[in-house]
């Protein structure tokens, strides 16, 4: 069976190479499939998720209502957290598809698709050693890595290895692996399906870095190189319009460190025409900043540059704090199940491709290799600098590591494709792959146990008290346990049969099955428990609110901005329940509202001190009540 399977794979590779057009068609179908699963499937089937997503969605809606595309507003106040690009894209989607969840999330999904395609393209052309695996010029039985810039053979980079008859199959393999890994993991899955700005930032920043490498790797093709560098500058400008200074600071640090290490800083910066590029970036990004500062003055400068940039790096903002290793844990969890192989992939990336005799991270060897062989090293700098930058930052938040995920996917794809070559062609199975496989099997077992027991842990959120019961009744805990249990069994079989180079397939199929049969149904249940009651309350508000009647919510420290989006009304959020009665007494007397609408839980409603005869219950949904409080009775 083992022989027939290997023969089938080999015949498939040969067919793949004989029909390059078919290879492209199949690859495009592969990209569309994984992108559909990761980003577009049931994209608008659930409501906006409090607290962050409705902030973006409503600010974009306000732009379509007011026609002010310069200053973002939310709930009657300016919102200076982020630059405008995400709002602009959402607003355009609203005008095309209507104001709904699908339109709010479409920019994230499209940029997720674009980033996945960009990773695929880069790996397709530069993801195998020097781009011509097995087509060495050193004669039968050996591989030579040729320095394309000097056209000389560095003798100390000569390694003996069986010649692989062709190279194209590995280029397609590593590209397909990388595309799957960059799209199918928890962190990209979340941000690619929600209306945050983080997926847009990751796509702009990641696309810019990949465009830089595509230009860097082709010095002999001047026109092509210039186009990729132009693309780099445009995407940097878009990254700035998405997140601000970090959109240029992080790529700048990554590229500077990489070029200094390979000793090509002056040479490459000259090729990039840095001054012209800086002018392009400024021309695209600076006008909006000038306009928003001109319109809002010091308030914008203090809020955006001071609070949301400088203070986030130097102090804790919004109580988002954590230990120095916080982002290591986020990578481990957020990039699962692929993250188990990252230590081995990072070590592999530090060694020039297929050079068994060289020392890890030996700079001289990298400097003598052709540029097109540097993708793994570039991804390594990308990964480590983003991780280090946000580990140093005092404010810790789980979205900050998203821009390093494309680099992690590239590192893992290079490593896995190398292991498949070793196992399938050379029948070699190194210790790092066996150890990674063993740890992966343990992870599968842990996930199976966690899925089975999770209903017992899901009753602590007061906004979703019945979540654990609903998950159990739907059978999702058992389904999840079966999926990961079967994955553990399959991984064990591969380990015992010395076929661990195919474990990536088990991870892929396991994660896709978990996405289809557990994550998607569970997201619907979570929405019905957590967000649907708020949408029902919002619908009631729209139906019963009288002209001039104020709308309040007792937030208890957790505001629900989705109420603003779904009611399309201004909502006053109160942290202290006792503030409700005093608010009504002190409200603008000129308006003289006879009553106000109050949204609260039964517990927080009691804490307001209001007697039952002072309010009228209009409706109840989930844990929330909508009541009308009489001003006359309170006074």
Question: For each of these PLM feature ranges, what is it?
Answer:
Residues 1-429, 454, 564, 620-623:
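Membrane-integral, polyisoprenol-dependent glycosyltransferases
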């Amino acid at each position: 069976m083992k022989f027939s399977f290997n023969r089938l794979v080999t015949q498939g590779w040969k067919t793949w190479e004989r029909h390059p057009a078919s290879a492209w068609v199949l690859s495009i179908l592969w990209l569309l499939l994984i992108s559909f699963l990761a980003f577009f499937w049931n994209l608008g089937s659930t409501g906006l998720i409090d607290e962050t997503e409705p902030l973006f969605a409503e600010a974009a809606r306000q732009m379509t209502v007011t026609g002010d595309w310069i200053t973002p507003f939310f709930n009657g106040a300016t919102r200076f957290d982020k630059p405008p690009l995400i709002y602009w894209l959402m607003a355009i989607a609203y005008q095309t598809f209507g104001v709904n969840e699908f339109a709010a999330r479409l920019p994230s999904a499209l940029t997720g698709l674009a980033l996945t395609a960009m990773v695929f393209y880069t790996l397709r052309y530069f993801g195998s050693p020097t781009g011509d695996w097995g087509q060495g010029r050193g004669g039968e039985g050996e591989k030579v890595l040729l320095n394309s810039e000097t056209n000389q053979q560095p003798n100390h980079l000569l390694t003996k290895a069986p010649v692989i008859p062709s190279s194209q199959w590995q280029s397609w393999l590593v590209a397909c692996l990388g595309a799957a890994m960059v799209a199918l993991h928890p962190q990209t899955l979340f941000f690619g399906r929600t209306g945050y700005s983080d997926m847009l930032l990751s796509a702009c920043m990641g696309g810019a870095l990949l465009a830089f490498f595509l230009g860097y790797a082709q010095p002999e093709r001047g026109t092509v190189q210039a186009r990729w560098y132009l693309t780099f500058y445009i995407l940097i400008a878009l990254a700035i319009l998405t997140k601000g200074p970090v959109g240029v600071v992080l790529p700048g640090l990554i590229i500077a460190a990489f070029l200094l290490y390979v000793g090509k800083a002056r040479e490459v910066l000259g090729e990039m025409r840095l001054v012209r590029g800086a002018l392009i970036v400024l021309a695209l990004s600076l006008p909006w900043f000038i306009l928003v500062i001109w319109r809002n003055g010091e308030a914008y400068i203090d809020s955006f540059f001071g609070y949301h940039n400088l203070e986030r790096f130097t102090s804790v903002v919004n109580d988002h704090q954590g230990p120095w290793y916080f982002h290591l844990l986020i990578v481990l969890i957020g990039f699962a199940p692929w993250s188990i192989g990252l230590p081995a992939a990072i070590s592999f990336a530090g060694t020039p491709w297929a050079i068994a005799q060289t020392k890890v991270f030996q700079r001289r060897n990298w400097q003598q290799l052709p540029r097109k062989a540097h993708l793994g090293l570039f991804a390594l700098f990308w990964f480590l600098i983003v991780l280090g930058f946000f580990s140093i930052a005092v404010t810790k938040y789980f979205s900050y590591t998203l821009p390093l995920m494309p680099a992690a996917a590239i590192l893992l794809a290079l490593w896995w494709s190398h292991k498949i070559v070793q196992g399938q062609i050379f029948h070699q199975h190194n210790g790092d792959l066996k150890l990674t496989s063993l740890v992966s099997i343990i992870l599968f077992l842990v996930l199976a146990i966690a899925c089975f027991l999770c209903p017992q842990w899901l009753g602590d959120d007061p906004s979703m008290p019945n979540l654990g019961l609903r998950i159990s009744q739907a059978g999702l805990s058992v389904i999840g346990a079966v999926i990961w249990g079967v994955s553990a069994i399959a991984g064990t079989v591969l380990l015992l049969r010395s076929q661990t180079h195919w474990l990536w397939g088990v991870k892929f199929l396991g994660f896709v099955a978990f996405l289809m049969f557990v994550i998607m149904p569970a997201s619907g249940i979570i929405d019905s428990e957590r967000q649907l009651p708020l949408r029902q309350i919002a619908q009631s508000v729209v139906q019963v609110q009288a002209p001039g009647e104020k709308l309040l919510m007792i937030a208890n420290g957790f505001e629900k901005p989705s109420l603003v989006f779904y009611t399309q009304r201004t909502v006053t959020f109160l942290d202290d329940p006792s503030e409700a009665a005093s608010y009504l007494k002190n409200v603008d007397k000129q308006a003289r509202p006879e009553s106000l609408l109050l949204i609260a839980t039964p517990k927080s409603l009691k804490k307001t001190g209001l007697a039952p005869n002072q309010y009228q219950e209009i409706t109840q949904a989930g844990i929330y009540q909508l009541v009308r409080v009489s001003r006359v009775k309170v006074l």
